[in-house]
Structures are given as C-alpha cells and as structure tokens.
Amino acid sequence: MVDFSLKKHGVSSWGRGSLSRKESSAGDSSSTFKSSRYQDMKVSDPELPKVSAKERSKAGTMMKRRLSVHQSNNFGAVKMDFDNMPALPSSAADYSFASNVGNATQTSLITEDQLPDRNTSLASLNTNTRRPDQELYSSKSLRQILSNPDFKAKKFITEKLGDATAVDIDQFTSNLNDLSLEIQDEIKFNIDKSFKEILIVNKGLETATTELKVLRTKVQEMKDIMNQFVTIAEKKLQAEQAANETADLNRTSSSASLSNHSLLPPLKPTPSATRKDRTSVYILERMWNEELMTLFKNVDGAHKYITSTPGRHILLESDNWIEINPATLKPLQKVRLFILNDVVLIAAPKPSKQTELTVSRFSPLRDVTVEVQSEHELSFNFSNKQHTLYRHRDPQVFSKVIDIIRQAKDALREISQAEEDTTRKIRNSYTLLQQERTPNRDATTSPVKVHGRQRSYGGTGTPSRHRSDAQNDALLTNITRSIHVRMGSEETTEVTKRLKRLDDALEDLDLEIGRQNFDLAITKLNHIQSSLKSLYSSATFDESVMVELLSLKCSQRKTILYTKLTNLLACETSDMTKLKSYMLNLVALNEPVDALEVFLQNRSNFINDLTLQIGIIDNVTSFITQVAIIRFQTLKKVTQQYLEVSKNLKRDYTSLLVCWCSEEVDKHFQLMERELSNSSTLSVQAIKITRKQIDELKPVGMDYVYKLDDFIRRNNNRIL
C-alpha cells in the first residue's frame, strides 16, 4: 500500500531533503544531464514475454489493490495541516530558482557562470520527463496503435512510457486490460453472430437440397412426359401421313375407275391407317402399374390381395383415419384408406414397427356398403358381416372419400349393366341366327317368338325359300347381270335405261343399310318399288323379267331392313328416341303390328330387369313401392309413346296396348300376392302407393282401379 500522507514528515526533513538534493545536483553538474534513465542501455530488441489474458487481468487487479485507499463507513472530511507543508514549485523556473538558492546557501563551489547550463539541463529535463498524452490511454487510440502492422512494442514503451509514473503505467495497464476485454467481447460476439449466420446458411442449404431433390424428381418426370408427348406426336404424324397417302391412293383409284368404268369398289385403307393410336392408353396403364407397384412396396401383403390386372388403378389414397371401436367409440388404431376402381384396401401400422403398413381390411367394392354415421365418421359394412367405423377430422377429406366411393360404385354399376346388355344382345343375335338358318321359315316372322310371345296377326306373305339370304342374293345378282347382257345386245330403250338406274340404286341401298341410315334406305326402297310398278305395264318380256328380278331384290332388302330393325328394337333398353325411330321405320315398312309387339316385349324385359336390380329387401312395403313406381311409370311412358306413334298409323292398334297393360297390372298383383305368401301381412302404405300409381294412368286413358279392389277384397284380412 502506498501512503500518500505528508503528516509524518516535518519542515526540517523536507528542508534537509531539499538541501541534499541541491548538493547532489551541484555535485553532478559537471556531468551531462541524462534526459532518460534508459538512454545508455544498448540492448537488442528482445522478444516480449507472452502473458495470457488471465495473468494480465490478475496483474491489473493487484495494481489496483496497491493504489487503493480503504476508508471506513463513517468517513469524514480529512483535516489537512497546510501550515507544516512546504510550498511546491509552480513551474520549472521556480523549481530551478529554488534549487539555485538552496545550493548557494550550502556550498560555494558553483559559480554564476554555471547557472545557465544548469537551467538549460533542467529545461531539457522538464521537456523529456513529460507525461504521456492522455490520448494514449483511451481504447480507441490504443486500438489504432496496436493495429498498426509497423508497431514495435519496445520502441513504443521507450518513447511513450520511459519517464511515466506508476499511476500512468497503472492507468495504461488498465486501459490495455479494458481493451483486451473489449476485444474478447467483440470476438465472442462475432463468433456468436457467425455461428448464427452459419446455422441460417445451413438451414437454407438443407432447404435448397430438399428442393433440388424434389426439382430433380419433377424434372425427370417432365422429361418422361415430354418423351411421351414426342412419341404421341410422332405416332400422330405417321397416322396423318398414312391417311394422306391412303386418300391419294383412293383418289387415284377412283379416278382410274371412273375413266375405265370399272365395277370394282375403291381400294380399302390399310389396317395401319385405320388403326387407332393407343399411345395415351399405354402411358396411362403404365402410370397405373407404377402406382400399384408403389402400393405393393409400401403396404406389406398387398400383393396377396390385389393383382395387377389391366385397368385396375388407385382412385384415392387417404391418410390420418382413425379406426373406432363401434361398441365403446374409443380409438383403436390409425389406418390409411386405399380406394381402387374395384376394391377397397385398408392398411394399418405394424405393432412392431409403426412406420411400416400391413393390410387390415380388404374387400371388393361391390361387396362394401358405406354409410355416413356423422359429420366425421364412416361405417364400412363388408360381405362377411364385419362392421368397422372410421373417423377423420378434415371435412373436405371426408367428403372427398365419400364422393370417390360413390363414383366408383356408379362406374361399376354402369360396367355391369353394359356387360349384361352385351350378353343379352349376343344371346338374342344367336337366337335370331338360329331362327334364320331354320328351313321353311317365314321371312317376316316377328322375333317376338324368340321371347316366348306368339304373334296375333300375320305378316306380308312372301314365299319361303330353302336357300340362305346370301345364296339368294348371289343368284339374283347373276341372273340380273345375264339379263343386262342380253338386253345390252339389243336396242337400248328408255325402260332399259331406267331399270339399270334402279339396279344401281339398289346397290347404293345396301350402303345405306350398312350405315344404319334406315330412314333414307326405306325412302329409297319405297321409291324403287313404286318405280318398278309403274314400269311393269309398259315393259317387254325381257324387261318384265328384269322388273320381277328387281322386285325380288327389293323384297330381299326389305327383309334385311325388317330383321335389323326388329333386332335393334328388341335389344335397345334405355334410349326412348331410338326406340321411337325404330318403331316409325317398321311402320314405314308396313309392319306396324310387329313394331308394336316388339316394342311392348322390350318394355316388359325392361321392367323385369329393373325389378331384379332392386334385389331382396326385408321390408315388403319398400319393395312393393319400388316395383309399383317402376311398373306403372313405364306403362304411362309406353302409352304416351304409342299415342305419338299412332299418328302415323292407318289403323288403330290400341287393343294390343290395352291387353299388354292389363297383363302387366296382373303381374304386379301376382307379385304382391307372392310377397304376401312369404310375409303374413301387408301394410296399408303399399296399397296407397299402388293406388296412387294406378291413378296416374287415368290421364292417358287407362283405369285399373277395379283390379286393385279385387286384390283388396281377396286379401282384406292380411292388410294392416
């Protein structure tokens, strides 16, 4: 501890100290005054010792303790005795003057000539022993000095701190320590800032890496799609080029045939030109197969239930569904729904590995009944009488799953209906072919016999033949050509020219029949028949034979038209516009009875098909209600259709319609009695709905309320 107090020193001691200093200064006046105590030191620049930050901090703390003054809590103002204190020199001149006076009183060895030199030495001492500038003590100045690349520590200490006091050195050390702490704080701050920036950059790099991976996948998919587009475009260009070549070839052949008057038909296009481009179908099937392969990879055991059949594909994959216990309504497990176009697969996590999926439920879509239990719950009823309940929080996903399942069921229903229609058409076609191959068959027999219904009226009595239509057609063609050759050798008359034109018109008629332009074909046929009748009276013998042959060919075309129209009328089930058109065409062929009979038989089959689609229902009232609506609404539409067609009829065939409607009503009540035999009672609601449907027939002129009254009278005791 440094004691700065002056109380222990008296005036005498201060004076003696001053005289001793004067004597020493007088004794040394002959020697050169040194401005610095380190002036004569000739030492090479040594390497400064390396002091750690901890030691520098410790040294600074020790210096502070040396220079500290401890004061008590009850410290008061210090009473200083200024009378016993010597007067201090105010400047260098006063100091030199006081020194000269003291030396003069002590010794006479110093002369006045030596005073100027001493004053000069004192002045130089005053100049060299100045304190360092206060600016050196600031952190900013020290930072600039130490950051200079040409900084030399020994030179700086010698020049700036050579004559510094302990207080100045301590202050300088404290400033260095503070600067060191500031630099350490800045280093820590910069490290922390750099670390945060590195974390941000790493996060950005991670995001960029993920996006690049996704982008790479998207780019690869885009390349595949572009390759597919290129393939499709090339196929289309090839098809267009082939079509153009075919058109040029047809044009050339047609021009050649016109120039040569050839009877050969134009050249047909090659199969490659007419073949449809199925590239898009192949691409779609490949995408579906890839989706199925992904399903097999992600769901363990899925390949055991689902096979990669053509056309099978995934419609929807929905996650985050919860299976609920129907009894306790508690969650059981998390599941994922896979809705395919024909099956439903439900996958759940494995007990050992929650990240892997395994098959939990599987069933064909036709055997699954989906019911909405609440806004977020779905109930799946499987064919094996299993009942499961699933819940999802998102209402949009919930609605989407329901819509996809309904659309898939509707598509399956349409496919089944189309398959049934195709099977029915094939069966009817086989039946008609078998009937056509039977010898001694009336050519105009209605196909209603195929369906088990006997005709009530006869047709146009054309003679029966033992040959098939193809043989007859070939025979008539050969005979016609021979007659044409015979008539061509003679003089050509106007009747002969007209007969040739009519023969050519019959050839064109075959094209219209093949294209199913029945209206135009029937119009041409009637025109040809009327023209032949007008030519028969003025024709010669050979020309009359030609007229008879052309009449036979017209009858043959009429038979072909009749067969095609009755077949189409018997097979069509849904399009009422086509049914009406076929009926009108048959009426134009003078076959109104067969047209009406085939149409009525078609509607009977339609009612039976709709009744079978209802299926087995435990509720008798619901079943009777649906059957009544189907049957009586069909009767109403058939009656309205007949009233529209009857405007073109020369006779009234309402009796056929009335008999058919009566039979259908009897079938309905027979069905109700059969249901009564299975069930003990019948509700009044079914009777009311049946009565309402019967009343709707009254506006079209049909009243069968009496049949309902007879049924109620017979089964009054079983109606509740």
Curated annotation (Swiss-Prot):
Swiss-Prot/TrEMBL puts the cross-link Glycyl lysine isopeptide (Lys-Gly) (interchain with G-Cter in ubiquitin) at 188
UniProt keyword list: Coiled coil, Cytoplasmic vesicle, Exocytosis, Isopeptide bond, Protein transport, Transport, Ubl conjugation
Q: Can you quote a single GO CC term? A: transport vesicle
The residue ranges flagged as biased composition, category Low complexity, are 253-265
> What domain of life is recorded for the organism?
Eukaryota
Extent of Basic and acidic residues compositional bias: 37-58
Gene3D superfamilies linked to this entry: Exo84p, C-terminal helical domain, Exo84p, N-terminal helical domain, Pleckstrin-homology domain (PH domain)/Phosphotyrosine-binding domain (PTB)
Note the coiled coil stretches, chain numbering.
168-252
UniProt entry tagged with the keyword Signal: no
Q: Name one GO biological process term.
A: Golgi to plasma membrane transport
Matches recorded under CDD domains? PH_RalBD_exo84
Q: Which Pfam families match?
A: Exo84_C, PH_EXO84, VPS51_Exo84_N
Enumerate the SUPFAM superfamilies for this protein.
Answer: Cullin repeat-like, PH domain-like
**Annotated localization:** Cytoplasmic vesicle, Secretory vesicle
Q: Where in the sequence does UniProt note compositional bias of the Polar residues kind?
A: 26-36, 243-252, 434-447
Q: Where is this region: Disordered?
A: 1-63, 243-275, 434-470
State its role.
Answer: Involved in the secretory pathway as part of the exocyst complex which tethers secretory vesicles to the sites of exocytosis. Plays a role in both the assembly of the exocyst and the polarization of this complex to specific sites of the plasma membrane for exocytosis. Also involved in assembly of the spliceosome.
Family named by the database record: Belongs to the EXO84 family.
Q: State how it assembles.
A: Component of the exocyst complex.
Task: List the protein's name.
Answer: Exocyst complex component EXO84
